Regions:
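Cytoplasmic helix-loop-helix junction between adjacent transmembrane helices
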Residues: 101-140
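A late C-terminal transmembrane helix in Major Facilitator Superfamily
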Residues: 325-361
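Helix-loop-helix hairpin linking two adjacent transmembrane segments in secondary transporters
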Residues: 135-182
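Helix-to-loop junctions at the C-terminal end of transmembrane segments
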Residues: 58-70, 257-270
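Extracytoplasmic gate region of multi-pass secondary transporters
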Residues: 27, 207-248, 255
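C-terminal transmembrane helical hairpin of 12-TM major facilitator-type secondary transporters
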Residues: 272-317
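Cytoplasmic membrane-interface "Motif A"-like loop-to-helix N-cap segments
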Residues: 68-78, 266-280
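Conserved MFS/SLC helix-loop-helix module at the cytosolic interface between two early adjacent transmembrane helices
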Residues: 57-93
């Protein structure tokens, strides 16, 4: 496969999609875990978060290692972990087994979230790199939607693990396809202590601030994905399966938002003013989206607007990754830092949003959104010149 071509970028993109599905495929199954294993809402929030432990602890250091062993190898390994994890889910018989597998499954994120953007940055030509990274950013909505759809049709049935079987097949296909991935150009060895090189990304202000900005978007976006099915079901008398399917379809609206943002950036639009508009929009849209008593139509329109804005904001932030990386051939460390910070935020997010859902105090939802948006604007590293 030709390095830097759109087909190769598209294949790399699929690893991000399948990995994001790992995060969300469990959400429609909350009732099944309660019925089958007596899992409480707090226990389910913990189960949801366990996936993020490996990237939260290891992603930045693993990214530095991936810069040496090769991002292609990392993606093949991630797909292999996906096959093993989903097979184990099908065989698990206890909550403890699910918890252990959920942690193991997090190693997919360690490999894919560092390896995939690094391989794109290393192989895409400079004139295509920014748009390719904006396209890459849409893996989140597509993957989250895929995960919700994988399980939504099986939720509440005797075959409630059916989504895990489908996910296994998807990762098996990616494992085979991984051997057709392009090989990145060789990376020069850098002098210095090995431990210092592993932690170098944490000492670079550009990647660190960009990663923290992305973490604020995770707090908003993933938080909504956690609470919306139950919130919508309670407000409108819908089932969890129906609410999860609506959210999955709504997440797809993030794709045109991300692509539009990528197009605007490629045409010279500055990223910070664009992010400013998007964060103000997020705070305003959260009101009709989460306020009790709104009509079904208004809430779904607000959901579509929210997802469009979220997709655009993610694209703006992710497209800044090549700008803050000193050498495009060594992007895995910076991508790993972004993954590690976002994983830490992902771990905390259910612990912030789930208690608000349980209390029914919806103004706290809006406060979390507004605070996260303000922090994103403060943290985002501004470009010194207009993007080319």
């Amino acid at each position: 496969m030709k390095p830097g071509s759109w087909p190769s970028i598209g294949l790399i993109y699929l690893y991000g999609v399948a990995t994001s599905a790992s995060l969300s495929k469990i959400i429609p199954l909350q009732g099944d875990f309660a019925a089958q294993m007596g899992v409480t809402p707090a226990g389910f929030s913990l189960l949801l978060s366990l996936l993020t432990i490996p990237p939260a602890l290891l992603a930045a250091a693993a990214g530095s290692i991936i810069d040496r062993i090769g991002s292609r190898t990392a993606l093949i390994a991630a797909a292999a972990v996906g096959v093993i994890a989903n097979l184990a889910y099908l065989l698990a018989e206890s909550l403890a087994a699910f918890q252990f597998i959920r942690v193991f499954e997090g190693f997919i994120m360690v490999g894919a979230y560092s390896g995939a953007p690094a391989l794109i940055m290393a192989t895409a030509p400079p004139e295509r790199r920014g748009r390719a990274m904006a396209f890459w950013s849409t893996y989140t909505p597509v993957g989250i939607s895929l995960g919700l759809l994988l399980s939504a049709g099986f939720a509440g049935t005797a075959q409630w693990r059916g989504g895990y079987a489908i996910h296994l097949v998807l990762f098996a296909a990616l494992l085979v396809a991984g051997f057709t991935l392009p090989r990145p150009p060789p990376v020069p060895l850098v002098a210095g202590a090995p431990r210092a090189r592993l932690l170098a990304a944490w000492t670079q202000p550009g990647p660190l601030r960009l990663s923290l900005t992305f973490g604020m978007l995770v707090m908003m976006g993933f938080g909504l994905n956690i609470v919306f099915p139950a919130w919508y079901a309670a407000q409108h008398g819908a089932s969890m399966g129906e609410a999860s399917s609506l959210l999955a379809l709504g997440n797809l609206v993030m794709i045109p938002g991300g692509l539009l943002a990528g197009t605007l950036l490629a045409r010279g639009r500055r990223d910070y003013p664009l992010l400013l508009v998007l964060m103000i929009a997020a705070a305003l849209i959260s009101l009709p989206l989460l306020m009790p008593g709104e009509s079904r139509v208004l809430r779904l329109l607000a959901l579509a607007a929210w997802q469009f804005e979220s997709g655009a904001a993610i694209a703006v932030v992710v497209a800044g990754l090549p700008r803050v990386v000193a050498d495009a051939r060594q992007g895995a460390a910076a991508a790993g830092l972004l993954s590690q910070v976002s994983a830490l935020i992902t771990f905390v997010t259910p612990l912030v949003w789930a208690p608000i859902l349980a209390s029914g105090q919806w103004p706290w939802f809006v406060l979390v959104v507004a605070t996260s948006a303000a922090l994103a604007l403060l943290l985002f590293p501004r470009a010194t010149s207009a993007p080319g």
